[in-house]
Amino acid sequence: MLFAQLNEYMAEVGLDASEQQKKQLVDFVGMLNKWNKAFNLTSVRDPEQMLIRHIMDSLVVSPHLKGSRFIDVGTGPGLPGIPLAILNPDKEFVLLDSLGKRIRFQKQVQFELGINNISSIESRVEAYQPEELFDGVLSRAFASIQDMLQWCHHLPKSDGCFYALKGQLSEDEMANMPQGFRVTDTIELVVPKLDEQRHLLRVVKQD
């Protein structure tokens, strides 16, 4: 059932994946649903809604990623990082979260589903100092872009960028971009079966 729905949704937005990748995505929903009962990883309880609100909501970002090394800050149970890693095995994803139960879940997903291009790290973002900087800093966890840039400013390479996953856009937020940063793209995302606004903002540092 979920497999057929995933096929339909991915075709609707023009995304390609192998049968193995689709199986990993559906199995991820199964693990999230199972672990959620004990560990309260997401407020979404229904697997069909997880497929829409977590899997497809993450995957529609994929065509807009530039580079090969990414960090997902405040990833929770691995969103959007794990679906994006499954769809992009040639890219590397670091999943950062400060809560141990979320990291344990991610590591179990990595083990059970055989995902080799993710690293899960338990840390607060301000305390995390990567050995190598990132092409892209992703997050759907921050309430405002200002917060994201304040806490994550040390993570991208000089030519890297921030990818802020947002719902409805706030004019105030867009008008009050912190000094030294510039929005290069505002992309309206379409998620199948989701009648809510979704946007991706690409932000770069200015010299």
Curated annotation (Swiss-Prot):
Top-level enzyme category: transferase
Keywords attached to this entry: Cytoplasm, Methyltransferase, rRNA processing, S-adenosyl-L-methionine, Transferase
Summary of the function given for this chain in its UniProt record: Specifically methylates the N7 position of guanine in position 527 of 16S rRNA.
Source species of the chain: Shewanella piezotolerans (strain WP3 / JCM 13877)
CDD domains in the record: AdoMet_MTases
GO molecular function list: rRNA (guanine-N7-)-methyltransferase activity
PANTHER family noted in UniProt: S-ADENOSYL-L-METHIONINE-DEPENDENT METHYLTRANSFERASES SUPERFAMILY PROTEIN
Main localization category: cytoplasm
Protein name as it appears in the record: Ribosomal RNA small subunit methyltransferase G
Gene3D superfamilies reported for this sequence: Vaccinia Virus protein VP39
Listed InterPro entries: rRNA_ssu_MeTfrase_G, SAM-dependent_MTases_sf
Catalytic activity of the protein: guanosine(527) in 16S rRNA + S-adenosyl-L-methionine = N(7)-methylguanosine(527) in 16S rRNA + S-adenosyl-L-homocysteine
Lineage: Bacteria, Pseudomonadati, Pseudomonadota, Gammaproteobacteria, Alteromonadales
Annotated S-adenosyl-L-methionine binding sites: 74, 79, 125-126, 140
Cellular compartments annotated: Cytoplasm
Underlying gene: rsmG
Assigned EC number: 2.1.1.170
Pfam families: GidB (PF02527)
GO cellular component terms given for this protein: cytosol
Family: Belongs to the methyltransferase superfamily. RNA methyltransferase RsmG family.
